[in-house]
């Protein structure tokens, strides 16, 4: 067997095993993903504003983080457009897209 084939086969086996874990345990996978997102979000301006460090459960999240509209995060987007980091998510976005703004004008997402 050709060496790259061995690597690809081993990697495919690894991915298959990982996929089976979340397929067979979807609630555990969702909980781990939730915890990772909250952990990473703690480092951001948005996460600090909504006290992500206190969030342990989905109910904590629901009671701490409001449902928002674009206008609510517009100040955060402005900071990102100025080049600031760790605003809505750790680091900086690769790029911002300009929407057509069908209901209320142009927006950056």
Residue ranges of each PLM-predicted region?
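Nucleotide 5′-phosphate-binding alpha/beta core
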Residues: 1-98, 104-109
């Amino acid at each position: 067997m050709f060496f790259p084939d061995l690597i690809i086969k081993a990697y495919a086996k690894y991915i298959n095993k990982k996929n089976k874990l979340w397929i067979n345990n979807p609630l555990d996978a969702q909980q781990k993903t939730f915890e990772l997102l909250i952990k990473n979000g703690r480092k951001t301006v948005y996460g600090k504003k909504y006290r992500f460090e206190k969030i342990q459960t989905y109910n904590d999240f629901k009671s701490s983080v409001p449902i928002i509209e674009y206008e609510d995060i517009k100040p955060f987007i402005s900071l990102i457009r100025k080049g600031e980091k760790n605003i809505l998510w750790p680091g900086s976005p690769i790029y911002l897209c300009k929407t057509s703004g069908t209901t209320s004008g142009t927006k950056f997402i």
